[in-house]
Design a protein with these regions (language model features):
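Non-ligating segments of multi-cofactor redox enzymes
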Residues: 1-226
Length: 226
């Protein structure tokens, strides 16, 4: 198993992606199906830390029609799909419908907890990471458990992530989606459109992995439909 994990990791890293842990589904869990129709026995999560995939994505995008919808999702599906085919797995995406419980899988695989923004807080990457897909296998692939990594939010007294948004989109009450969307699209939303979420950028952890402004602008445009 270790050899295969190393081979999968090597196949992913050429496109800036990494394995984000995994686990074996309990026998009584309603696991998703693999291509053959059988229930998957294990899942390996695929994602990114920081902006590592961005140059690879941009090179791919230059070769695609300008009208392609959801280009980052399309690129992720292609890259992870190729790896899945090479290793006899089924590739799935967070945007697949019906939606799969990716956040729950991530908690199980890496032992992370949500930040006040809902994004899982990573002890190294902070809020600057993402899950791009997963590989489902018909065999049991046992990985070491994640343990209990420190939850950095517990030690953060100031909580700047709840104090930086001009419309208080994030609070202890949750995410005010409509208020955020209206602000980003409006006349005062240029800082958010060009540099990303102010609350997310206010987080003091994992700053060396923070996405550059052009990447944050790309994600904000996708969120706001701009």
């Amino acid at each position: 198993v270790r050899g295969m994990i190393e081979e999968i990791s090597a196949a992913l890293v050429v496109n800036g992606l990494i394995l984000r842990g995994g686990f074996v589904f309990p026998v009584d869990e309603d696991a998703p199906h693999i291509a053959s129709g059988a229930l998957a026995k294990s899942v390996l999560l695929v994602g990114q830390a920081g902006a590592a995939p961005w140059p690879h994505f941009l090179r791919w995008r230059e070769q695609q029609p300008s009208t392609i919808a959801n280009p980052l999702d399309s690129w992720s599906r292609q890259v992870i799909g190729d790896v899945a085919e090479a290793f006899g797995a089924r590739a799935v995406s967070p945007s697949d419908k019906p939606y799969l419980p990716f956040q729950q899988w991530a908690v199980r695989a890496e032992g992370l907890k949500p930040s006040p923004l809902g994004i899982l807080m990573h002890p190294q990457y902070g809020l600057w990471h993402a899950y791009r897909g997963a590989l489902l296998f018909e065999d049991e692939i046992a990985l070491p458990g994640p343990g209990e990594p420190a939850h950095l939010c517990d030690a953060c007294v100031e909580k700047p992530c709840l104090k930086s948004c001009p419309v208080d989109a994030y609070s202890t009450k949750g995410f005010a989606y409509q208020a955020c969307l209206a602000h980003v699209r409006g006349g005062n939303g240029e800082p958010c459109r060009s540099g990303g979420c102010l609350d997310r950028n206010a987080c003091p952890y994992g700053t060396e992995y923070r996405y550059p402004p052009d990447i944050q602008a790309f994600h904000m445009a996708a969120f706001a439909g701009l």
